[in-house]
Amino acid sequence: MVREEIAVSTRTLQWKCVESRADSKRLYYGRFMLSPLMKGQADTIGIAMRRALLGEIEGTCITRAKLDKVPHEYSTIVGIEESIHEIFMNLKEIVLRSNLYGTRNASICVRGPRYVTAQDIISPPSVEIVDTTQHIASLTEPIDLCIELQIQRDRGYRMKTPNKYQNGSYPIDAVSMPVRNANHSIHSYGNGNEKQEILFLEIWTNGSLTPKEALHEASRNLIDLFIPFLHAEEEGIRLEDNPNRFNIPFFTFHDGLANTNIRKKKKGIALKCIFIDQSELPPRTYNYLKRSNINTLLDLLSNSQEDFLKIEHFRIEDVKQILDILQKHFTIDC
């Protein structure tokens, strides 16, 4: 194993790109470092950056395709090697680069016999095809293939909605994720109280963005998320002004037991034998309850809203989730 030597700043927080390469038109790699950081800071930044890289960056992709005289998505056409479904899967993989907003139209209109590739897509000037060699279909006979396409910019993964097939137009599962993968690692150095950390970020993209561009965009998105906290006090924003605010009522085991619905529905069942892992609580809420030694429905109903909010990192939203679960499964009218 070769040890890597990297010069780091001992005072000013700095970042640098330590490795960058293009493995192919649709696979870029970049490795970045940030230092010096105090103990714990590298993990905080690394986790936030990875989530922002994978989930907050927008991408452009084909979201709908239309072919005339095609009865359904799994049809086949004489003279085309692939089924319509396979053609749609190939269109889904086409990597596009664009800063467009809203929806744009594109098209393919070719005559066989020939191979159809991404180069045959007639797109608006604002849309660039990253890899024009990407395969779409193989025409084995002298037939015409015309496909109308819809291009959209979005983020994340959006599954096609069932029963949205209109006039030969079919939705395509949209994968608007320019970052294919992201990892972070931490290197500690120094001794005792002087111990510091270096954060390493590895980013793989699909070619529509370079890793450096992805890092910048993810950073901007994170900053935008935190800006409201910086200006909340200046603008005099108060919790009472929030129209979406909700009040969580207090509840106890005795109040719940007095409710006739729960007594009828759960008659003869010892509440202490019903464990909270049977209640479909979200993992975050479940973990905090377990850490607080709340294991059964009896434990759950023996606590009030105030008791739950005393649990470290527990939020009003978590209490509301508990109420929703109780109302759903035990018919408690809170």
From Swiss-Prot:
Catalytic reaction annotation: RNA(n) + a ribonucleoside 5'-triphosphate = RNA(n+1) + diphosphate
Keyword Ribosomal protein tagged: no
Enzyme Commission (EC) number: 2.7.7.6
SMART domains, alphabetized: RPOLD (SM00662)
Region (Alpha C-terminal domain (alpha-CTD)): 268-334
GO molecular function, one term: DNA-directed RNA polymerase activity
UniProt-listed Pfam families: RNA_pol_A_bac, RNA_pol_A_CTD, RNA_pol_L
Keyword match Transmembrane: no
Region (Alpha N-terminal domain (alpha-NTD)) location: 1-232
Keywords associated with the record: Chloroplast, DNA-directed RNA polymerase, Nucleotidyltransferase, Plastid, Transcription, Transferase
UniProt xrefs under InterPro entries: DNA-dir_RNA_pol_insert, DNA-dir_RNA_pol_RpoA/D/Rpb3, DNA-dir_RpoA, RBP11-like, RNAP_asu_C, RNApol_insert_sf
Subcellular location: Plastid, Chloroplast
Gene3D superfamilies: 5' to 3' exonuclease, C-terminal subdomain, DNA-directed RNA polymerase, insert domain, RNA polymerase, RBP11-like subunit
Gene Ontology terms: biological process: DNA-templated transcription
GO cellular component, as recorded: chloroplast; DNA-directed RNA polymerase complex; mitochondrion
Disulfide links within the chain: none
Function as written in the Swiss-Prot or TrEMBL entry: DNA-dependent RNA polymerase catalyzes the transcription of DNA into RNA using the four ribonucleoside triphosphates as substrates.
Family (UniProt): Belongs to the RNA polymerase alpha chain family.
Subunit and partners: In plastids the minimal PEP RNA polymerase catalytic core is composed of four subunits: alpha, beta, beta', and beta''. When a (nuclear-encoded) sigma factor is associated with the core the holoenzyme is formed, which can initiate transcription.
Domain notes: The N-terminal domain is essential for RNAP assembly and basal transcription, whereas the C-terminal domain is involved in interaction with transcriptional regulators and with upstream promoter elements.
Name of this chain's protein: DNA-directed RNA polymerase subunit alpha
Gene: rpoA
